[in-house]
């Protein structure tokens, strides 16, 4: 009787799995024809028929749900499609943990759905286990950049650079990031303004100069100088590691230019920044000195004519 029961149970499970696979194949047909809602319905029936789960069903269900997502949408239908995909990829990871696609598609779906809070919590959890987890740090930089969390993206970029002090590009990246921010926040239209008095005009008769205005949200004054100095600090680090780093020299010039815009009401300080910017621009554009190949034949010494 016990043997018969085991056989019946095994046979029943086998039939359930066969039925599930039949519905999965039907779902695949709908998927290929572009009817993604119908495909999802068939995959859900397959799940009901075989509750133990088939990883391929969850994979295809998740992909079908992703096809119903609309970039940038916040509608209820979008949220249902996102949740459907995430749940399917979560089950796939549980059923087939050695298959990297489950985890990769789960993360990609979070990115595509702008679920940045979930991603941030996930990577910060990784950092609690290992504060120097470079993969988690790089992921946080990516997430915060996508979410336009500039301060957080900068914080983690600085963390990466501090953990890799001998990586010139890590230092350079922080400097470039800061330059871009300065340019976007009030630095695009100030280059033509010179706050110094015109030496050809009598100071008593010279009209008052009006600097180009900043707008709400721009970096200005002491805050602009502070941020520029931070970028200069990291660009200096890049040049300490790689003294011939021409791109870093070029951005050093640009950073000093942006710093000068914090001194539009202080001509002397403005002039120091502009002159320093020109010095760095000159270094960046200097021709590379020609070097003789190490294995080049040496010229024979001249002989005195006899």
Please identify what each model-predicted range represents:
Residues 56-57, 102, 136, 170, ...:
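TPR alpha-solenoid repeat register
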Residues 59-61, 105-106, 139, 173, ...:
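Canonical tetratricopeptide repeat
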């Amino acid at each position: 009787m016990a043997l018969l029961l085991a056989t019946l149970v095994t046979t029943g499970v086998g039939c359930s799995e066969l039925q599930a696979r039949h519905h999965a194949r039907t779902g695949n047909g709908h998927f290929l024809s572009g009817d993604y809602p119908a495909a999802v319905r068939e995959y859900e029936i397959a799940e009901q028929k075989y509750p133990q789960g088939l990883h391929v069903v969850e994979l295809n269900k998740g992909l079908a749900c992703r096809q119903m997502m609309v970039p940038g949408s916040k509608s209820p239908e979008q949220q249902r499609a996102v949740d459907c995909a995430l749940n399917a990829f979560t089950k796939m990871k549980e059923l087939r943990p050695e298959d990297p696609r489950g985890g990769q598609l789960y993360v990609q779906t979070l990115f595509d759905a702008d679920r940045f809070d979930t991603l941030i919590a996930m990577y910060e959890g990784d950092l609690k286990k290992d504060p120097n987890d470079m993969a988690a740090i790089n992921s946080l930089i990516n997430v915060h950049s996508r979410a336009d969390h500039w301060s957080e993206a900068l914080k983690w970029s600085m963390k990466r650079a501090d953990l890799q002090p001998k990586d010139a590009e890590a230092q350079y990246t922080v400097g470039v990031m800061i330059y871009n921010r300065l340019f976007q926040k009030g630095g695009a239209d100030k280059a033509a303004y010179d706050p110094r008095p015109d030496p050809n005009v009598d100071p008593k008769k010279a009209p008052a100069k009006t600097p180009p205005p900043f707008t709400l949200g721009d970096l200005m004054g002491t805050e602009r100088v502070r941020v520029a100095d931070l970028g200069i600090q990291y660009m200096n680090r890049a040049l300490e590691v790689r003294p011939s780093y021409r791109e870093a020299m070029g951005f050093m010039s640009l950073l000093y230019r942006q710093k000068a815009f914090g001194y539009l009401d202080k001509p002397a300080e403005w002039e120091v920044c502009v002159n320093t910017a020109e010095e760095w621009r000159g270094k960046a554009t200097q021709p590379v000195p020609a070097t003789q190949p190490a294995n080049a034949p040496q010229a024979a010494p001249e002989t005195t004519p006899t």
